[in-house]
A protein has these predicted regions:
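N-terminal alpha/beta PP-like core and its mobile active-site loop of ThDP/TPP-dependent enzymes
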Residues: 1-99
Length: 99
């Protein structure tokens, strides 16, 4: 089993049904294989706020998950990460890229 497969299996066991993602991230393909619905966004900040909304609307019962590229993609997402952290909103952020 590859690490990315293990991550997706753990996400599924934790009840994550949707993975918001900005390409390129290998987790997107493996999440789809694990029956986690990938939704592709056009900008990192938007995806992070969507993950934040999933957690807020479910009162934390469903954790919003967001995957993005490493480097500049992560920097674009910092505003949303800081807001979620400051307001104690549970989100899962998975920065990755080409291996």
């Amino acid at each position: 089993m590859k690490v990315v497969e293990a991550i997706c299996e753990i996400m599924k066991r934790e009840g994550i049904e949707t993975l918001l993602a900005y390409p390129v991230n290998h987790i997107i393909e493996y999440a789809a294989r694990t029956d986690i619905r990938p939704i592709i966004v056009r900008q990192e900040r938007v995806g992070l706020h969507m993950a934040d909304a999933i957690s807020r609307l479910s009162s934390g019962k469903s954790i919003g998950a967001f995957a993005m590229q490493h480097g500049p993609g992560t920097e674009n997402a910092y505003g949303g990460i800081a807001q979620a952290y400051g307001e104690s909103v549970p989100i899962l952020v998975l920065p990755a890229g080409y291996a």
